[in-house]
């Protein structure tokens, strides 16, 4: 007897983009464990499962003020582009940038002109007629470059990036840092450097790479080299400094930054509809 329901299958399909039968088989093999089911789908070759697994169903926008970034969600893109929704997001991010808050939870617990931010959002939700959610808020210190990206001209920004950097802080340095912010927006790195990747994530990638190679009937003697190559490919996909630069794809980002005299120390990337 299976230990999952049709709703579980749908959830896994929505999460990964895999087909119904593949999702059912993966859940069966994983005994209902979602994380294991995602691994099973990756080993079986489901395309882009790792990249799709962070998606959530939401509309909204990303707003910024100075060194702060905020994601405010709504139910439809119609509301996302209304003046009142855009103004609310801007009011909240400016308030967050001015005060000492550093997270969405702290921002929700703060007050604007004597009124709680959570209450303010609820009032606007009632006026607009849709559920509104303050999903994320972040703020960086030091020298920061900002980039916002619109997915459609008639919609507000859906992707926002903050890049904290040192080294050259003149106009040329700022241009280089903003170029990195554009890279982050487009290429979706999850980590700054290899050192930031948790050991359990690297181990999971090694396990998946080995299982996949065995499924492909690769020679046993070749497995270590194949696994190492696939783990390195993971780093090149998801680690910013290891990615090929969008300005010069023959060089990794770390080399381009070193040549420019810029060191990225931290970044934040928000995208509407992504976890």
Swiss-Prot record:
Matches recorded under InterPro entries: EF-Ts_dimer_sf, Transl_elong_EFTs/EF1B, Transl_elong_EFTs/EF1B_dimer, Transl_elong_Ts_CS, UBA-like_sf
One GO CC term, this protein: cytoplasm
Places the protein is found: Cytoplasm
Main subcellular location of this protein, as a coarse class: cytoplasm
Region (Involved in Mg(2+) ion dislocation from EF-Tu): 76-79
The keyword Cytoplasm is assigned to this record: yes
Keyword Protease applies: no
GO molecular function: translation elongation factor activity
Keywords from the UniProt entry: Cytoplasm, Elongation factor, Protein biosynthesis
Gene3D superfamilies, sorted: 1.10.286.20, DNA helicase RuvA subunit, C-terminal domain, Elongation factor Ts, dimerisation domain
Pfam families: EF_TS
SUPFAM superfamilies found in the cross-reference section: Elongation factor Ts (EF-Ts), dimerisation domain (SSF54713), UBA-like (SSF46934)
Record's function text: Associates with the EF-Tu.GDP complex and induces the exchange of GDP to GTP. It remains bound to the aminoacyl-tRNA.EF-Tu.GTP complex up to the GTP hydrolysis stage on the ribosome.
Family according to the record: Belongs to the EF-Ts family.
Protein name in UniProt: Elongation factor Ts
């Amino acid at each position: 007897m299976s230990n999952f329901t049709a709703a579980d299958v749908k959830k896994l399909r929505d999460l990964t983009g895999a087909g119904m039968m593949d999702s059912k088989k993966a859940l069966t093999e994983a005994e209902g464990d979602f994380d294991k089911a995602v691994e099973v789908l990756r080993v079986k070759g489901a395309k882009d499962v790792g990249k799709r697994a962070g998606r959530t169903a939401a509309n909204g926008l990303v707003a910024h003020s100075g060194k702060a970034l905020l994601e405010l969600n709504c139910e439809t893109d119609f509301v996302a582009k209304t003046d009142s929704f855009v103004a609310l997001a801007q009011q909240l991010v400016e308030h967050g940038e001015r005060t000492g808050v550093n997270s969405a939870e702290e921002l929700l617990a703060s007050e604007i002109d004597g009124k709680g931010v959570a209450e303010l959002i609820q009032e606007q939700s009632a006026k607009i007629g849709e559920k509104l959610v303050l999903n994320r808020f972040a703020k960086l210190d030091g020298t920061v470059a900002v980039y916002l990206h619109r997915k459609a001209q008639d919609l507000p920004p859906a992707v926002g990036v903050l890049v904290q950097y040192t080294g050259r802080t003149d106009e040329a340095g700022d241009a280089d840092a903003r170029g990195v912010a554009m890279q982050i927006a487009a290429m979706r790195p999850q980590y700054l450097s290899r050192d930031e990747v948790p050991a359990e994530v690297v181990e999971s990638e090694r396990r998946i790479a080995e299982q996949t190679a065995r499924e492909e009937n690769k020679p046993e003697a070749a497995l270590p080299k194949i696994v190492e190559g696939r783990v390195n490919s993971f780093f090149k996909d998801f680690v910013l400094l290891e990615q090929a630069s969008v300005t010069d794809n023959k060089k990794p980002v770390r080399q381009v930054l070193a040549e420019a005299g810029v060191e990225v120390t931290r970044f934040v990337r928000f995208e509407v509809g992504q976890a």
